[in-house]
């Protein structure tokens, strides 16, 4: 069992990583006997895990209600958020309730925002079931829903009480979802840890076959990196922005193509190549390093070009609505070397458009 602490003073919390955690009531601390829980999951995961998690919580004396949401990025919306509020109010659940997010990034982000908003804030626990959510979205307290004009535009910073990562969940993950998660894994190597990127080049095949020790190390390292960044910059005023490598381009793809048509990790993968091409055009990143990124993403089964039906010009309106925009100016996360990156302002739209075009004609 691995345990990492996200250090935020009184709001610090543990990330527990192991197999078989759904069999242990102690995994779900700080829940105690007699407490009330609303378990939030989706229609795909409910048949796999709902009864198991409900059973282990009830074994610990916890009172459990549940709400099952439709599955898909297109349902990360205000309308679906309202169904969670309705379920909480119908019982009713008070300010002493705990929300448990059992699912991937959509369930985790939406449940976290529900917890941040319901009666001005109730406790919640993240139980991520996808690789993407285990290595990234469940850690750090970013909660949100989408708007038709932009991804994650309505949300809050709100930290969980704990994160429970059961490695056994990956056994039921479709290959496309596994690849999507690997995009965020590869991102950490590009922006922060060149040695980890080297390790990924050597061990990607083991991750694709869900080798236990390799996957446990991979998730632990990603969570360590994320925890360090969040502890240093919880509200994304500086360092934490680096975690958005590929996301400015990727969110544009998701919004333009319709949420759910491109998985988040797929869009981020293409976006990371666009960021690398942008950095190349600025003369601060080598084509050889871009090729290393492309090769690793391709081996993971991820796209390295944008959608053919999306023109370079179609990216700009979405990118100019990005949350990192300041005074109307785009701020891009760009690699400087494998393992090192920067937040860059003042890049001309023409250069960005040419970099995007590089990734359409490649």
UniProtKB/Swiss-Prot annotation:
Q: Which domain of life is it from?
A: Bacteria
Q: What is its main location?
A: cytoplasm
Output one GO BP term.
amino acid biosynthetic process
Please give the Gene Ontology molecular function terms for this protein: 3-dehydroquinate synthase activity; metal ion binding; nucleotide binding
Xref: InterPro entries: Dehydroquinate_synthase, DHQ_synth_AroB, DHQ_synth_fam, DHQS/DOIS_N, DHQS_C
Where found, per UniProt?
Answer: Cytoplasm
Q: Where is it found, in Gene Ontology cellular component terms?
A: cytoplasm
How does the cofactor attach, per the note?
Answer: Binds 1 divalent metal cation per subunit. Can use either Co(2+) or Zn(2+).
Q: Part of which pathway?
A: Metabolic intermediate biosynthesis; chorismate biosynthesis; chorismate from D-erythrose 4-phosphate and phosphoenolpyruvate: step 2/7
Residues bound to NAD(+) are: 71-76, 105-109, 129-130, 142, 151, 169-172
**What EC number(s) would the UniProt record show?**
4.2.3.4
PANTHER family for this protein:
3-DEHYDROQUINATE SYNTHASE (PTHR43622), 3-DEHYDROQUINATE SYNTHASE, CHLOROPLASTIC (PTHR43622:SF7)
Q: What does this protein do?
A: Catalyzes the conversion of 3-deoxy-D-arabino-heptulosonate 7-phosphate (DAHP) to dehydroquinate (DHQ).
Under what name is this protein listed? 3-dehydroquinate synthase
Native organism is Escherichia coli O1:K1 / APEC
Lineage of the source organism? Bacteria, Pseudomonadati, Pseudomonadota, Gammaproteobacteria, Enterobacterales
Gene symbol? aroB
């Amino acid at each position: 069992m691995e345990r990492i602490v996200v250090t935020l003073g009184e709001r610090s919390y543990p990330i527990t990583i192991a197999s078989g955690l759904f069999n242990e009531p102690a995994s779900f601390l700080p829940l105690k006997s007699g407490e009330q829980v609303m378990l939030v999951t989706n229609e795909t995961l409910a048949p796999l895990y709902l009864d198991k998690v409900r059973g282990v919580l009830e074994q610990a004396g916890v009172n459990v209600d549940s709400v099952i949401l439709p599955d898909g990025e297109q349902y990360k919306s205000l309308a679906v958020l309202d169904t969670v509020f309705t379920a909480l109010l119908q019982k009713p659940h008070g300010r002493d309730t705990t929300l448990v997010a059992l699912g991937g990034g959509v369930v985790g982000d939406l449940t976290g925002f529900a917890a941040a908003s319901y009666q001005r804030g109730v406790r919640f626990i993240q139980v991520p079931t996808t690789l993407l959510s285990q290595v990234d979205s469940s850690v750090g307290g970013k909660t949100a829903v989408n708007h038709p004009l932009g991804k994650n535009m309505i949300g809050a910073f709100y930290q969980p009480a704990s994160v429970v990562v059961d490695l056994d969940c990956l056994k039921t993950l479709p290959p496309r979802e596994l690849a999507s998660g690997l995009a965020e894994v590869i991102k950490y190597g590009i922006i922060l840890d060149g040695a980890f990127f080297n390790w990924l080049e050597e061990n990607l095949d083991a991750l694709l076959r869900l080798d236990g020790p390799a996957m446990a190390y991979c998730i632990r390292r990603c969570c360590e990196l994320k925890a360090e960044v969040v502890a240093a910059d919880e509200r994304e005023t500086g360092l934490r922005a680096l975690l958005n490598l590929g996301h400015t381009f990727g969110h544009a793809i998701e919004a333009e193509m319709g949420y759910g048509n491109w998985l988040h990790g797929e869009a981020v993968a293409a976006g990371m190549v666009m960021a690398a091409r942008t950095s190349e055009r600025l003369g601060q990143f080598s084509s050889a390093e871009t090729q290393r990124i492309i090769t690793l993403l391709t081996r993971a089964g991820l796209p390295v070009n944008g959608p053919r039906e999306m023109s370079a010009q179609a990216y700009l309106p979405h990118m100019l609505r990005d949350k990192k925009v300041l005074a109307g100016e785009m701020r891009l996360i760009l690699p400087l070397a494998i393992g090192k990156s920067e937040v860059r302002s003042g890049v001309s739209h023409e250069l960005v458009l040419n970099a995007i075009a590089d990734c359409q004609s490649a």
